[in-house]
A protein has these predicted regions:
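An N-terminally biased module of ancient metal coordination in phosphate/nucleic-acid-related enzymes
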Residues: 1-80
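Active-site beta-loop-alpha junctions enriched in small/polar residues
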Residues: 17-19, 52-53, 88-92, 120-122, ...
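Non-catalytic positions within long, well-ordered alpha-helices that form the structural scaffold/packing
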Residues: 40, 136, 193-194
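Extended substrate/RNA-proximal surfaces in nucleic-acid metabolism proteins
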Residues: 58-171, 253-271
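Short acidic/histidine-rich active-site segments
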Residues: 197-213
Length: 271
């Protein structure tokens, strides 16, 4: 791909498992450095290091994540890799999540009001919407990660536009948009983008291989579906707004095109 002035080092990836040896992402420093090089080559200048916080499986916390980021920053500098790191976590549902956020045990994205919120992958949780509303009521903006990849999205699809309308944000995975996760996640990512609102695209990278930190191709796909301006909002403008901790009402909202126009757009794109 030949990069223009707009694409060179202009993107922000707010969901990445790059920190070495802390979850199911990069297993070691060599892999983490390889991932960082891939991100830079793709045009990414800032990455949120977002390891899992999953009680009983990945017992990470804000203090440990910050220490890991500090160590990795030193490694990047020694390797001559220019990549800005900010803190975050891929936070799974937990009954005490609001309290953990308030106590600082769970980090938000770069210390903002926004944080990554991961629903269970295989089972629709009965109290998901209730917890999202509680988080919003306490001043947090949950960024719901990869809804397009959840096995239960078909039977609960309306839940996601409803939560987004209430104030939650939705983040799609770049690889789902480009088809790396198969036809089903690609279909749901297209449907969500068609009908809105989708706020962010991120890599959810876990390796330097199939799940690497690459989002440029997904941005190009989004540009064909939504237009250039909105595609850049997904990977640059709204991520920057999160880093700046802007109130959601100060951020350009994603377009709400509705079902009819969305399906018409998809029909026309196949011609």
């Amino acid at each position: 791909m030949v990069r223009t002035a707009d694409t060179v080092r202009s993107m922000i990836d707010l969901h990445c498992h790059m920190l070495p040896g802390i979850d199911d992402g990069a297993p070691d420093l060599a892999t983490a450095l390889a991932m960082a090089r891939i991100a830079v080559a793709d045009g990414i200048h800032t990455v949120a290091c977002t390891p899992h916080i999953y009680p009983g499986l990945y017992e990470n916390d804000a203090a440990g994540i910050r220490r890991a980021i500090a160590d990795f920053r030193l490694a990047l500098a020694e390797a001559g890799i220019e990549l800005t790191l900010v803190e975050g976590a891929d936070t799974h549902m937990a009954p005490d999540l609001v309290q953990s956020l308030k106590a600082g045990r769970v980090p938000t994205l770069a210390g903002s009001r926004y944080f990554l919120y991961e629903p269970p992958h295989h089972v629709a949780p009965p109290r998901l919407e209730e917890q999202v509303f509680a988080l919003l009521a306490n001043g947090y903006v949950p960024v719901i990660t990869h809804p397009e990849r959840l096995t239960w999205i078909e039977s609960h699809y309306a839940l996601f536009p409803r939560m987004a309308k209430a104030g939650a944000w939705l983040q799609l995975t770049a690889g789902a948009i480009t088809g790396r996760f198969g036809k089903r996640p690609q279909y749901w990512s297209q449907k969500l983008m068609d009908e809105g609102p989708v706020h962010l695209i991120a890599s959810d990278a876990h390796s330097a291989g199939r799940r690497s930190p690459v989002i440029s191709e997904a941005r190009e796909r989004a540009a064909r579906q939504l237009g250039e301006a909105e595609s850049w909002a997904l990977v640059r403008d709204r991520p920057q707004a999160i880093l700046d901790d802007l109130s959601p009402d100060k951020v350009l909202a994603p377009p709400l095109r509705g079902k009819a126009l969305g399906w018409w757009a998809r029909l026309m794109s196949r011609r």
